[in-house]
């Protein structure tokens, strides 16, 4: 008897044709089926295309000559030179416009030299005033035959997909003594205080950095909230655009930055919440106040005079991209429908002496900067209304009061964007 056991041949499985890469950074998932067999699946990891495209090459980051040149600039100011060099090279720019506020013009020639040396481009420093992100002047840059513009110290208020040429926004964030900010807030507010904290884009990193530190401090914890009105960054405020806050949810507002212009936007929008300012330059912490009663009185008087007006001068601001053609058209249609005569005017800057020459016009409505009317309206010989105030005049928006005056000009549906905000009574 033959006890030899016949060897069973394993079942042959057809080889799967290999397509693509063998190496993967994905995640392996093993599933056990009811019959006891295991099914192994390899999931693909997410590829962050944007992050890959925006990665600055090592040859730029590690360029010794470039890094030495950057050291000539203030070390606590982040001009993002590496990023700028990379973007200029990537887009193959030949002539680059540099636009910055007056306070930074002192560094413009040094930045110009660096970019010309390491990008092999010609640079043009734009010397006209730049009050904010709304003043980005891609039109003038294009007229100067530039194919790229770097706009400094303001956020991306004007989308880069609608500009005439390639745009790079450099926030110029500024490093400050965060420990002093934290200790100052803890010294001035009781434990557990709820603070709406915000600032200009330069100090946005600090606004976010101190939040976690104060929240996790068991000895003197403070609740820090960084409000956001889209499309602005969280914790960012503009002189014409700020978030409307619930007065029952906050004990105070804290602004980190110098000057009052941007802070006043939040004070006007939220008059019932106490406001404070931390100035990172002189390291002073102050209680700030705004005369909302006077604001309502002055702007109310302007509306009363405007009610009698028959000829309206509709001004399109031409300083950068301050003006919005859609808002002008919308206001023109409403005014004509209300029986008013409309005269359209284009001005880069609006002065009382200039408007005084239009002696046949009864009322002006400016589509440029709402703060021009709010801060300086009393100095003009005729009423100078904002788009919001003009809509109030025509019974298309809610009347302001000592408790509420909207400061949402550049929010997603704001008048500054040619749209109609939520508080409007008529949605067209």
UniProtKB/Swiss-Prot annotation:
Binding positions ([4Fe-4S] cluster): 134, 240, 369
Major subcellular site: cytoplasm
Keywords annotated in UniProt: Cytoplasm, Iron, Iron-sulfur, Metal-binding, S-adenosyl-L-methionine, Transferase
GO biological process: protein histidyl modification to diphthamide
One Pfam family from the record: Diphthamide_syn
Annotated EC: 2.5.1.108
GO function terms (MF aspect): 2-(3-amino-3-carboxypropyl)histidine synthase activity; 4 iron, 4 sulfur cluster binding; metal ion binding
Cofactor(s) this protein requires: [4Fe-4S] cluster
Protein localization: Cytoplasm
Pathway entry: Protein modification; peptidyl-diphthamide biosynthesis
Catalysed reactions, as listed in the record: L-histidyl-[translation elongation factor 2] + S-adenosyl-L-methionine = 2-[(3S)-amino-3-carboxypropyl]-L-histidyl-[translation elongation factor 2] + S-methyl-5'-thioadenosine + H(+)
EC main group: transferase
Function as written in the Swiss-Prot or TrEMBL entry: Catalyzes the first step of diphthamide biosynthesis, a post-translational modification of histidine which occurs in elongation factor 2. DPH1 and DPH2 transfer a 3-amino-3-carboxypropyl (ACP) group from S-adenosyl-L-methionine (SAM) to a histidine residue, the reaction is assisted by a reduction system comprising DPH3 and a NADH-dependent reductase, predominantly CBR1.
Family listed: Belongs to the DPH1/DPH2 family. DPH1 subfamily.
Cross-referenced NCBIfam families: diphth2_R (TIGR00322)
Protein's name according to its UniProt entry: 2-(3-amino-3-carboxypropyl)histidine synthase subunit 1
Organism this protein belongs to: Candida glabrata (strain ATCC 2001 / BCRC 20586 / JCM 3761 / NBRC 0622 / NRRL Y-65 / CBS 138)
